[in-house]
């Protein structure tokens, strides 16, 4: 019995060893290689299906039917662009630049005693304005603005009343007044600055053009370009062709007492010789003959007296005699 039981237990063990595991069997049935990892990979959904499930690019709302591109209100129907005035509107109504600014300044100008008169005829003069506006009150003066280049009227001017109330009354009653066939317009001056009859004139310091050389002035004072000074020809630097500051003619006599190129000198006689008032003879003239030169000349004279000039004597002895002498 014991032997039979051992044999039966051995048979069961052998059966267990020989029987394949269920996992490997399934793997062999599915893959044929016994690889369980590939089985799990095959069970995952394929990549191709995931790509097909993603929406195509052609139907993207941001690409094809994007409202920002095709129907963007900022492009086609932008209220900022569509509502801006077009060129036709500018031609029809104007750009509203200087005219609007001028009218706004004129309308906001505070009442004053200066009344501007605009739209005048070219032949209207200052006396005509004074005669026309003097019926409203006393007038200080009238300025008719003239063109500086042509000298003609610019067709507007300013009437200066002594009282501001008279200017206010004249403005109210003289609107659309006919003067020399022109309908004039009156308004208060928009500026407090005085109005000049010829605008454009420069009242400041003189400015020199870089293309022109500045005026030449003497570094020592007055004087024009050709030497005449502020005091009758003796300005700073003196006359260019006459007397200088030291008081003498440049080519004539000197104030120091003598001619520059000859004559006597206050410092002691003739410059080129003669006696010196400071102490007798200066020792000779200025061109080389002083006391030392005189000593050399005396020595040479004594040498000639003793023996003569040997070279001159030999030359006299060797001279050929006259062949024609008999």
Curated annotation (Swiss-Prot):
CC per GO annotation: cytoplasm; nucleus; phagocytic vesicle
Q: Where is this region: Disordered?
A: 1-114, 179-326
Q: Where is the composition biased (Basic and acidic residues)?
A: 38-55, 240-326
InterPro entries according to UniProt: Nucleotide-bd_a/b_plait_sf, RBD_domain_sf, RRM_dom, SLIRP/GR-RBP-like
Gly residues bias spans: 220-239
Q: Which Pfam families match?
A: RRM_1
Q: Which residue spans adopt a coiled-coil conformation according to this UniProt entry?
A: none
Question: Which keywords fit this entry according to its UniProt record?
Answer: mRNA processing, mRNA splicing, Nucleus, RNA-binding
Q: Per the record, where are the segments of Polar residues compositional bias? A: 104-113
Instruction: Name the SUPFAM superfamilies for this protein.
Output: RNA-binding domain, RBD
The molecular function terms of the Gene Ontology recorded here are: mRNA binding
* Limits of the RRM domain: 113-191
GO BP: any one term: mRNA splicing, via spliceosome
Localization in the cell: Nucleus
Report the function annotation for this chain: Sequence-specific RNA-binding protein which participates in the control of pre-mRNA splicing.
Q: Would you tell me the protein name for this molecule?
A: Transformer-2 protein homolog
Origin species, per record, is Dictyostelium discoideum (Social amoeba)
């Amino acid at each position: 019995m014991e032997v039979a039981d051992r044999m039966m237990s051995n048979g069961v063990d052998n059966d267990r060893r020989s029987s394949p595991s269920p996992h490997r069997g399934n793997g062999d049935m599915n893959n044929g290689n016994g690889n369980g990892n590939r089985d799990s990979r095959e069970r995952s959904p394929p990549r191709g299906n995931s790509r097909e499930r993603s929406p195509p690019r052609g139907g993207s709302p941001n690409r094809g039917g994007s409202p920002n591109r095709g129907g963007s209100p900022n492009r086609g129907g932008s209220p900022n662009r569509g509502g801006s005035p077009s060129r036709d509107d500018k031609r029809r109504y104007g750009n509203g630049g200087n005219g609007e600014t001028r009218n706004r300044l004129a309308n906001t100008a505070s009442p004053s005693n200066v009344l501007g008169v605009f739209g005048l005829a070219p032949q209207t003069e200052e006396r005509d304005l004074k005669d026309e506006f003097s019926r409203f009150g006393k007038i200080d003066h009238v300025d008719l603005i003239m063109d500086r280049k042509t000298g003609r009227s610019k067709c507007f001017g300013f009437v200066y009343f002594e009282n501001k109330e008279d200017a206010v009354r004249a403005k109210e009653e003289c609107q659309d007044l006919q003067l020399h066939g022109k309908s004039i317009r009156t308004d208060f001056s928009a500026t407090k600055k005085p109005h000049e009859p010829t605008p454009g004139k420069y009242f400041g310091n003189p400015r020199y053009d870089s293309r022109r050389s500045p005026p030449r002035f003497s570094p020592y004072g007055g004087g024009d370009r050709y030497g005449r000074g502020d005091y009758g020809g003796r300005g700073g630097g003196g006359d260019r062709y006459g007397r200088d500051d030291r008081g003498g003619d440049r080519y004539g006599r000197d104030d120091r007492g003598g001619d520059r190129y000859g004559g006597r000198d206050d410092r002691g006689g003739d410059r080129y010789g003669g006696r010196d008032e400071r102490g007798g003879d200066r020792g000779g003239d200025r061109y080389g003959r002083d006391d030392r030169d005189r000593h050399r000349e005396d020595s040479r004279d004594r040498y000639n007296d003793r023996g003569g000039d040997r070279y001159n004597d030999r030359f006299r002895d060797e001279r050929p005699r006259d062949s024609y002498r008999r």
